[in-house]
Amino acid sequence: MTHFIFVTGGVVSSLGKGISAASVAALLEARGLKVTMVKMDPYINVDPGTMSPFQHGEVFVTEDGAETDLDLGYYERFLRRAKMTKLNNFTSGRVYQDVLNKERRGDYLGGTVQVIPHITDNIKERVLRAGEGYDVAIVEIGGTVGDIESLPFMESVRQLMVELGHKRTMLMHLTLLPYIKSAAELKTKPTQHSVKELLSIGIQPDILICRTEYDVDADTKRKIALFTNVEARAVVVCKDAKTIYQIPRGFYEQNVDDLICERFGFTDLPEADLTDWDNVVEALLNPEYTVRVAMVGKYVELPDAYKSVNEALLHAGIKNRVKVQIDYVNAEELESQDVSILKTADAILVPGGFGERGTEGKMKAIQYARENSIPFLGICLGMQLAVIEYARHVAGMPEASSTEFNRSTKYPLIGLITEWLDERGELQQRSLESDLGGTMRLGAQKSELVEGTKTREVYGKAEITERHRHRYEMNNRFIEAIEQAGMKISGYSSAQHLVETVEIPEHPWFIAVQFHPEFTSSPRDGHPLFASFIDAAKTQHQKSK
């Protein structure tokens, strides 16, 4: 029987609902419970797959190929025993699309289709389905309490809490305690009004997570409890931390897990063992020294556009006991700049992306890394550009390009994938006329790594499974020419022999991959490719001293 914890936010956005929810999930998992998480997004887009990174940040790809909210990345990084799927994230757009399709088919037998019950029933069905087979499902509602877009979700939560009952549901509400410097005190009124807004919907919070920059004394906690109908011990202070990976320990010290276990009747559970999290925090806060990675992209003004890459580099720093400082380099600006901006870098990374804008700047950075023996990692488009750069400057194909940028190029090193097998082994076919949304090669795919290559050495095995998100791929017609020039194809897809990884054997560390290894990195386990990349950056750092 699944128990549900619903997570809402009030006062302002960006309070950290996803991180707080994931920290609670990690705490419950540490007590032996089987936990999953769900994110409900109120926007009308069917999914974030076609949204600009400047609007939404990163699109996180699950193993089964869902394009989801970046919060699902937090969920997977904090949980070890649960992987997110298509069931774990849905939007208003997805719900309305489903309901309208049913109406067109006549499923409602001519009845009037309304928000209540049709939209709310669809939301409830999705929540219950996602929670099947788990002890606890933590469900985050995007946006802020009071937003008009989230009202159907709030009503669905209210109904579920009534239908499932007190012993199977809880509501955790995040709020802000602002500090007024002129009065030298924390203000509780915004929290009171936020809870009042919840109560007007018919929802009583059970736990309050109070975000603040300052310590909160017992009197303030009692005041909050009095005016919000919450137990004083359920008023939890979440003070700004040096790293988000300190949050599980902070919640543990305030007995959040005990509150939940008591409510749900979970008895005889072991105490939470947070040793792994303590080790992560210790390594993060006490690095031996700093290495610098230049990340060359076109969305660098918004670091959330590369959230999983940023986190994977952080995790690699943990594994190598160094601090990884990311120097963001605007690829478009680099096209007209001198490469001297890259001279302080111990390693260079070109992440994924779409479109021609900024590609010449990225290739300029790739060429610099190749010619100056700087460790280089290319991801998705980063691999495609590494191949094009090598073809232009080493393999004698000066007009090499991708058909994404130039359909009439003389040397189409990169072309549209027209056929591939998806994660279920089903044939997928695409053309230039296909819709943009949901039409890429998505999700986990198996690859075979070539024996004797650095990539195989890094992974330590012949077959790997990594997640993909792309429409274009290296053209196999040019494999022989590229390899004769000195670049090695070090990995192929198991099903269609598509190029998955390339490397330069004569370079100290130059690897580029078509997939997205950042999606499977975690703070406790890291990822072998990123760990090896930062190890190479350490070597480069020592050489340059």
Swiss-Prot record:
What is the regulation of this protein's activity?
Allosterically activated by GTP, when glutamine is the substrate; GTP has no effect on the reaction when ammonia is the substrate. The allosteric effector GTP functions by stabilizing the protein conformation that binds the tetrahedral intermediate(s) formed during glutamine hydrolysis. Inhibited by the product CTP, via allosteric rather than competitive inhibition.
Gene3D superfamilies tied to this protein: 3.40.50.880, P-loop containing nucleotide triphosphate hydrolases
GO BP terms: 'de novo' CTP biosynthetic process; pyrimidine nucleobase biosynthetic process
Q: Indicate the segments annotated as coiled coil, or none if absent.
A: none
Positions of Mg(2+) binding = D71, E140
Which sites bind ATP?
A: S14, L15, G16, K17, G18, I19, D71, K239, D240, A241
Cellular component GO terms held in the UniProt record: cytosol
Q: Where is the active site?
A: C380 (nucleophile), H516, E518
Explain the purpose of this protein: Catalyzes the ATP-dependent amination of UTP to CTP with either L-glutamine or ammonia as the source of nitrogen. Regulates intracellular CTP levels through interactions with the four ribonucleotide triphosphates.
Q: What is this protein called?
A: CTP synthase
- Give the source species: Acinetobacter baumannii (strain ACICU)
Q: Which gene encodes it?
A: pyrG
